[in-house]
């Protein structure tokens, strides 16, 4: 279970969804069930304990046949050159293709380059790319109160599958449908904006310190 996957599982369970968390590392799952999380995130353990009757864990991929909606939530790492390693995402897609039932909906949450969803998925009528922008330290609050859902679809003009739409509507925020590539670019654009905002703030804080200004006062203004 990744940071992205576990936080989204906790958030969805809070909306009364029953969650099956898959990881091929049974030892990791056993530790998570005991409350020993592989990372620190405020309120995550609290929600997992609160909703333990709705969250189940498995290392058996055959159990995916039980799922109506399958979220692929691999944390994608990038190297110093900014190149993403998509190996694990591709492996998970292959695993889902092999074990999911034919009526299941697949939703990709991971950060991937434009055209990835269209190229690597099967049965695209039932495949969606959902933009998530969780931040370490704020993941649960952002997962529980999204500003909007950006959903990449094969046919944006069509209604979303009933179960998927019901889950999204439970968060009471706008749902923006668009084609796969537009949604994938949105994810990149949001991340670039967040990164540039941090750089911009750090630069202004440094200027304030060097010139005698008070960055806290500047921020308030």
Residue ranges, per PLM feature:
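Short, well-ordered coil/turn residues at beta-beta hairpins
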Residues: 71-75, 109, 153
